[in-house]
UniProtKB/Swiss-Prot annotation:
This is Molybdopterin synthase catalytic subunit. The keyword Cytoplasm applies. The gene is MOCS2. One of its GO terms (molecular function) is molybdopterin synthase activity. GO terms for biological process: Mo-molybdopterin cofactor biosynthetic process.
Length: 198
């Protein structure tokens, strides 16, 4: 069974609930001594506001590709057997699951670390958007993980650009290693070291 066949990735259309047992059963295997799961559910309060439901939208083809890539990265980092990722679209009432991640592994540490990585990366980079609906209004939410990742990527990009500019300047510059400074013979001692002329 290839690594691709050991991943179950589903973006569930509106009206379909996350069947937690289905995904845990999928990752179960005799060689797996651990199954780590994360279940994200709609809570009833956020910053003092009463939440009625969350509503999710996604660019499904890209979301699926991103999740597949994240699973590949997890597999290359930890010794894991199977991965299941499910995310609902549409309204998700209070108390219901919107996202589930299940990871099976021989040992718990790999499963737990991979599970945390998968949910963090999902929230930071997968094109799934959330609207929080309150008793007194609604708002599209931007994940803090997404913003942190954008800042991190911008800092890396800026660092790479600066490094490239500096390297290019050094390579093409009129100074630096291309200029050879001839030392005045009277300022050298017999060992060849420079002497101060003060």
């Amino acid at each position: 069974m290839s690594a691709e066949e050991k991943n179950l990735i589903e973006i569930l259309e509106e009206g379909h609930k996350v069947d937690v047992v289905k995904y845990i059963d999928y990752v179960s295997a005799p060689q797996a001594g651990a199954i780590a799961t994360f279940s994200g559910t709609t809570r009833d309060m956020f910053e003092g506001k009463t939440v009625l439901e969350l509503r999710y939208e996604a660019y499904v083809p890209m979301a699926t590709r991103c999740l597949s890539s994240i699973c590949t990265t997890a597999r290359s980092t930890w010794d894991i057997h199977k991965i299941a990722v499910a995310h609902r679209l549409g309204p998700v009432p209070v108390g219901e699951t919107s996202v589930l991640i299940a990871v099976s592994s021989v040992h718990r540490a790999d499963g737990l670390d991979a599970c945390k990585f998968l949910i963090d990366e999902l929230k930071a980079s997968v094109p799934i958007w959330k609207k929080e609906v309150y008793t007194n209004g609604e708002i599209w939410k931007e994940n803090s993980e997404f913003m942190e990742k954008r800042l991190e990527l911008a800092e890396k990009r800026d660092s790479i650009v600066k490094k490239t500019v500096v390297e290019e300047h050094r390579r093409r510059g009129c100074c630096g290693s291309k200029v050879r400074v001839e030392e005045d013979e009277e300022h050298k001692d017999i060992t060849g070291d420079n002497k101060s002329s003060s």
